[in-house]
Design a protein with these regions (language model features):
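Conserved N-proximal alpha/beta basic substrate-recognition cap immediately N-terminal to
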Residues: 1-103
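Short secondary-structure junctions
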Residues: 5, 84, 170, 256-263
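Short, solvent-exposed loop/turn segments at secondary-structure junctions
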Residues: 14, 36-37, 67, 117-119, ...
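Structural motif
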Residues: 31-33, 112, 174
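Short, surface-exposed coil-to-beta transition loops
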Residues: 46, 183-186, 264
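Hydrophobic alpha-helical segments and helix pairs
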Residues: 78-136
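Phosphate-binding site of ATP-dependent enzymes
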Residues: 109, 121-122, 126-257, 270-273, ...
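C-terminal active-site "lid" helix and adjoining low-complexity regulatory extension at the edge
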Residues: 237, 241, 251, 255-266, ...
């Protein structure tokens, strides 16, 4: 209430979607935290509802149309020419996938395949070629990013058939090189619209084979995400690139107006190869828009200020 904002919760489920729509239409603005996939459910009912609400006047963040541009793995392909990019490829059909993946695995080493929409490591695979004997099926070693996953070896054709489900509902698969510095950790850059509001560093275990003790052992669990403010010294080079270069370039490429950027979103970076002078580089591995939490302690104040500003614009104050 310090900024004059009266907030109230709105709990969504498909069974009472109409009641939620009626509630949202009485609001000036709506902040949305809903995973793209959760316990077998998707946003196929929620997203049209939010589009309808936004068309009738209330401001919605993040708008579903913005999520479809930013918060999907395809953004890794569309922005691969930016400084955060890598040798990224996109497969829109099973035919493209079957034609391009086998030679790429032979020539480019381990890859990471990602379904377009998902969370929690669902549909994200480290894939590497084990053997490709002449006249016999090629064998892969694959590891999914889901917690407690274990590596498995199987024929290439069998794995590609398994992945065909990711093309349903106009889906696609993004293909990136595996980053060898993954054990160094991941940096989550928290954004309030086009400004950095904090960072989180975490030693992740996804796509790393579990220790001998097993995938459910303490040693196999990810470390805590250590939160930092936007001014944290270790991340100032990344902050400068995000604010001055990469975010402006991204919204231009994606055709997103600056005023449509989500109030809170984050970009996950892995450490790329060091430069000749020993400086770190950063490779984007995901943008999260649909349900960003937890957040640094400094972020809520920035979210509140941005929300207040957007609401004033919506009302024409």
């Amino acid at each position: 209430m310090a900024l004059g904002i009266r907030a109230e919760p709105a709990v969504f489920d498909e069974e009472f979607a109409d009641e939620v729509r009626d509630q949202l239409l009485t609001m000036d603005g709506v902040l949305v935290w809903v995973d793209p996939l959760h316990e077998g459910k998707s946003r196929e009912v929620l997203d049209p509802l939010l589009r309808d609400v936004a068309a009738r006047g209330p401001w919605v963040s993040a708008h579903p149309d913005v999520i479809l541009k930013m918060g999907v793995k395809e953004v890794l392909y569309r922005t691969k020419h930016l400084g955060w990019g890598a040798d990224t490829h996109l497969y829109r059909t099973p035919a493209e996938f079957h034609a391009a993946l086998p030679p790429r695995l032979q020539s480019a080493g381990p890859r990471v395949l990602k379904q377009n929409r998902g969370n929690g490591g669902q549909g994200v695979w480290k894939v590497e070629l084990v053997s490709a004997p002449a006249g016999k099926p090629s064998i892969l070693r694959v590891l999914q990013a889901l917690r407690e996953s274990v590596p498995e070896e199987l024929p290439l054709a069998e794995f590609m058939t398994r992945c065909e489900a990711y093309f349903a509902a106009e889906g696609c698969i993004v293909d990136q090189p595996f980053q060898p510095r993954l054990p160094v950790g991941m940096i989550r850059c928290y954004m309030g619209a086009d400004r950095v509001v904090g960072f989180g560093h975490q030693f992740i275990k996804a796509l790393i084979p579990p220790p001998p003790e097993g995938p459910d052992s303490p040693a196999a669990q990810p470390g805590p995400r250590i939160m930092h403010g936007a001014d944290a010294a270790p991340f100032q080079a990344l902050r400068a690139k995000m604010e001055a270069e990469w975010t402006p370039q991204m919204i231009e490429v994606l055709g997103i107006g600056a005023a449509s950027l989500p109030i809170i979103w984050d970009a996950d970076f892995l450490y790329g190869p060091r430069t000749a002078s020993g400086e770190d580089t950063y490779v984007l591995c995901e943008i999260n828009v649909s349900s960003v939490f937890a957040i640094p302690d400094q972020a809520p104040a920035a979210i509140a200020r941005l929300t207040s500003d957007r609401l004033r614009r919506t009302r024409g104050d």
